[in-house]
Regions:
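Alpha-helical transmembrane segments of integral membrane proteins
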Residues: 5-9, 46-47, 71-81, 91
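Membrane-helix boundary elements
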Residues: 1-15
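Juxtamembrane helix-capping/reentrant segments at transmembrane boundaries
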Residues: 33-48
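Membrane interface segments of multi-pass transport proteins and intramembrane proteases
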Residues: 32-36, 63-70, 95-103
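Alpha-helical transmembrane segments of multi-pass membrane proteins
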Residues: 12-22, 48-56, 77-88
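Membrane-proximal cytosolic segments adjacent to transmembrane helices
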Residues: 82-120
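Membrane-helix exit/interface motif
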Residues: 25-29, 53-66
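Membrane-interface helix-loop junction between the first two transmembrane segments
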Residues: 11-14, 20-37
Length: 120
């Protein structure tokens, strides 16, 4: 594994873990903790980890057999998983502490449909 692979792995595990923990805290605070939902959540996290593992393996194969891939499948997959998890973490955190929803620093996470990349 390269240094980048190690950091990607750490990032994926970090975001997946934080999402799970914030989801459990949110459920506890809403008095809605369910073992069925926890099992489903763990299943989803397991699926993400398997997807990351498969992406890493594709990159390893590509190092030895030219598959013609222009970029790292692993890095792209980890980036996607981390962004999905970040969205869920933000949803959980703003339900745990509703005051954060309108906090000025949260604006950096708001999706914009206008501006230089928006429809004009």
């Amino acid at each position: 594994m390269t240094q980048a692979d190690i950091w990607c792995t750490i990032a994926a595990i970090f975001f997946i873990s934080i999402d799970y923990v914030t989801g459990v805290v949110k459920a506890i605070m809403r008095d809605n903790l369910s073992s069925r939902k926890m099992r489903e959540g763990l299943g989803h996290k397991f699926a993400y980890l398997m997807l990351v593992l498969v992406a890493w393996f594709i990159d390893e194969v590509n190092r030895h057999i030219d598959l013609g891939l222009p970029m790292s499948v692993f890095v792209c997959t980890v980036g996607g998983v981390c962004l999905i998890e970040l969205t869920s973490i933000l949803e959980n955190v703003t339900e745990i502490n509703p005051g954060l929803k309108n906090a000025p620093f949260m604006r950096i996470f708001v999706q914009s449909t206008s501006g230089k990349h928006g429809a004009e």
